[in-house]
Amino acid sequence: SPFDHTSKVYKCKNNRYRCKNTGKYFNVKTGTIFENTKVSLQNWFIAIWMCMSHKGGLSSMELQRELGVTQKTAWFMLQRIRKCCGFDNLSVLTDEVEMDETYVGGKNKNRHANKKVKYSQGRSCKDKVPVFGMIERNGKVVACVVPSATAKDLIPRVIKHVNSFATVYTDEWGAYNGLNDTYDHYIVRHHMREYVRGKVHTNNIENFWGNFKRAIIGVYRVVSPQHLQFYVNEFVFRRNTCKFATDDRFLYFMENVQGYRLRYKELIEYARCS
């Protein structure tokens, strides 16, 4: 059973099962993103299929029109799906790995005067959220929202997700200097207008950021900082399965829906506390 893997299980009425050791009842949806949902599984499968087949992202308004549900329900369904996409954002990268950080948020100059953030320039952007990404050439990508783009927040994530025998490529941002102690580290100097030097470049990870930001601008319009990691998960999953056929991507996702349940209360409380 999902409550005790050593327990016997009894089949009960109404497609339910009972765990002998804990006495708890469960069904095939328990512990998955479908647990206690009032939306039909047919609509869930349609929503997941649409997410898997839309290369540039799927908005809650479009899903609302397709399923005939409220925008709130469509948004919550998509957030559950995006959280589940995080199962493919845990890879350990080897061989040649590019890494780069980016900032997500609107341009300060475009804000109304009473909403502009003072002293917000360059890397001191107080109004933007830093996101750190690593991509293995001809392999997978890992990306996560970070508190800051400093060494104390970036280096531990590199050590966690990049094999110590890998060769890493970065730009000249000072937070990466600590990588020299562990990795074979090469730097491309963008401030000198150097973008490619043989195999030394960060073009793949920058391409990933470009696709991600175009989706935010063109599909989602506005993404709250508190939920940004869910959107990052979605695009990491898209990139890591870019060579999959849509049906294969759908099945790969469905094989990993266990353990990623998200309650609406948790989603809202997380936003309030962040």
List the model feature ranges, each with a label.
Residues S1-S274:
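Residue-level recognition of single "structural anchor" positions
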